[in-house]
Amino acid sequence: MRYLDQALEAYGKSDVYPFHMPGHKRNPLPFPEVYGIDITEIDGFDNLHHAEGILKEAQQRAADLYGSAHCYYLVNGSTCGILASICAAVKKRGRILAARNSHKAVYHALFLSELTAEYLYPAVTECGIQGQITPRQVEDALKKDPEISAVVITSPTYEGVISDIEGIAKVAHVHGIPLIVDSAHGAHLGFGGEFPQNAVRLGADAVIESLHKTLPSFTQTAPVSYTHLRA
C-alpha cells in the first residue's frame, strides 16, 4: 500500500503528459520552497478577507491586467466567485436569466438565494456538443420577462465554445441589468494575438476565471473581476 505523497511523486516523475488541470502541466517552474513561505495573517502580509495592503495591491495589479475596476482573489476555485456574483447581483427570490449548460455552482446560487430562473438553451453543434448563447436569445428572453435582474452564461465552455460576449453585454445593459460570465476556462483569453479578448474587456460586469485551469497556477486559485455590479 502506497501513501498519497508517494503516489503523487511517482505520477509526477512518469512520462504521462497531463491533458488535465492544473495549467502548469507539472512543469518545474521557478518557485520559492513551499514550506518557507507558508504563513498565516501576520503583520505586513495583509488579510485576504479584508485586504488593505500588499494583497490589495496585488489584486489591483490583476484588475489592471484584466481590465476591470476590481479583482478579488479566491481560494476555493471559481465556485465561490459564481456564488458571490449571483448573490450580489440578484436580490433574494428574484429572477435571473441563465444558460442551461451552466456549472452546478450557478444552480447552487439559485438555491441559496431562492431565485427563479429562465433558461437559455445553447444550440447543439454537428459535433454533438453544446454551442453558443446568442444576443438574440438574450434579447428575446428579456423582452418576455422584464423582471429578470441579471444574465449569467458560460464562455468559454468546457469544450472551448465562446459566445458573443460583447453583443450579449450590450443587450443586457440596454435592459439595465448586469452580465455575469463564468469564464473559468478562459483565464488565458486576451493574452496573445491568437486568443479572443477576455470577457471583462468585452463589456461583462462580473467575470469569474480559474487561473489553475489554463495558466500555470496552483489548484483552486481563481480571481473574480468586477466592472460595474450592484444588487
Language-model features and meaning:
Residues M1-G53:
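N-terminal "arm"/small-domain region of PLP-dependent enzymes with the aminotransferase-like
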Residues V34-G77, N101:
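Conserved N-terminal alpha-helix of the aminotransferase class I/II PLP-enzyme fold
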Residues H70-G94, H108-A109:
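Conserved beta-loop-alpha segment that forms the PLP phosphate-binding cup at the N-terminus of a helix
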Residues R93-I153:
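PLP-dependent aminotransferase-like
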Residues I129-H188:
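Active-site phosphate-binding strand-loop segment of PLP-dependent enzymes
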Residues I162-H175, G186-A206, S210, T214:
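Active-site pre-lysine segment of PLP-dependent enzymes
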Residues R201, A222-Y226:
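Short beta-strand-to-turn element immediately C-terminal to the catalytic PLP-Schiff-base lysine
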Residues T227-A231:
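Conserved small/polar residues in nucleotide/adenosyl-binding loops
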